[in-house]
Amino acid sequence: MGKLENASWIHDSLMKYLNSTEEYLAYLCGPKRSDLSLPVSVVYALIFVVGVIGNLLVCLVIARHQTLKTPTNYYLFSLAVSDLLVLLLGMPLEVYELWHNYPFLFGPVGCYFKTALFETVCFASILSVTTVSIERYVAIVHPFRAKLESTRRRALRILSLVWSFSVVFSLPNTSIHGIKFQQFPNGSSVPGSATCTVTKPIWVYNFIIQATSFLFYILPMTLISVLYYLMGLRLKRDESLEADKVTVNIHRPSRKSVTKMLFVLVLVFAICWTPFHVDRLFFSFVDEWTESLAAVFNLIHVVSGVFFYLSSAVNPIIYNLLSRRFRAAFRNVVSPSCKWCHPQHRPQGPPAQKVIFLTECHLVELTEDAGPQFPCQSSIHNTQLTTVPCVEEVP
């Protein structure tokens, strides 16, 4: 008897929603507009302006300045391109869905494009950051190897692989998405209910999300942390081997700059990408949803979206504006006729008379204090050094 009364109550509630298509859609899909649509849109607009201007400047200064066309800057150029794709193509779709959760008006092609875009740029960004970290590790710990192997042609080959892998690994998640319509109890489709969502069994989606989060977040984050830890140990060891006052004066600021940059790289990577992957993993591990779990997930989803786009806006600041050379290039692009905006070159002193190791040249190259060129020792003598210009210049 109790079951019959319960079934009757459900039937009465459902019939109430069936009297209005909009009410029935709200019953099935939730509100058509997010409660946070206005404040989130304002935040997104600020991120959009800062991110687009910053990343365009990065691409422009690298393309216009021959001295900035180095292997490391090629990776930063790739990172700026992926950030621009997110901001110019991904963010407008995100803002649209904040104001119109349904229907999805761009059809199956638009759904596939949206999913593939986000997956591809997500993977390409992380792989680019990881590649930069590996390059810097080699430059600091294995400078002779970096001198021989780190070339622009090699960087272009690696970037081709990065984007190819990103596209390939975006296909599984893209293939399980599509347009889904809600249905009335009689089996007919509800008008205006089209959404871009998972159309295959949910366990397939959960497996893909968990696998890609491991491959494209947990592993890179672990690798980057280990590499920066090893670089820190190497820099600390080199600090203890300083033999004279000249070497101390040259490398004390460089060590501080490198340490600060490494810390910022790891910190920003973790802060911006952790909420995004927590959001995906949270959804993939929950089997039975309750009202409280749904509220927590919605909050995480909003926060993860803000940090996801924020990473695209702060990358030009973190990876480029900490470099003195990039700052000078930015000033040159923004105000080429402004003479007082550009720092004057200091006159170079006489050649050093002390012993300076080859590894120290690469430490200088990684700092904001690096000028257009720094002398590298071609051989170790106690007399005047024979010098050659540094080939690879890291911003």
Swiss-Prot record:
A GO cellular component entry from the record: membrane
Keywords in alphabetical order: Cell membrane, Disulfide bond, G-protein coupled receptor, Glycoprotein, Membrane, Receptor, Transducer, Transmembrane, Transmembrane helix
GO biological process, one term: phospholipase C-activating G protein-coupled receptor signaling pathway
UniProt-annotated glycosylation sites, renumbered to this chain: N6, N19, N186
Major subcellular location class: membrane
Top-level division of the source organism's lineage: Eukaryota
Cysteine-cysteine disulfides: C111-C196
Cytoplasmic side, ranges: 63-74, 139-157, 234-257, 315-395
Tissue: Expressed primarily in brain tissues, more specifically in medulla and spinal cord. Widespread distribution in peripheral tissues.
Membrane topology: Multi-pass membrane protein
Transmembrane regions listed in the UniProt entry: 42-62, 75-95, 116-138, 158-178, 213-233, 258-278, 294-314
Compartment(s) of residence: Cell membrane
Keyword Transmembrane assigned: yes
Family (UniProt): Belongs to the G-protein coupled receptor 1 family.
Role: Receptor for the neuromedin-U and neuromedin-S neuropeptides.
Entry protein name: Neuromedin-U receptor 2
Organism per entry: Mus musculus (Mouse)
Annotated gene: Nmur2
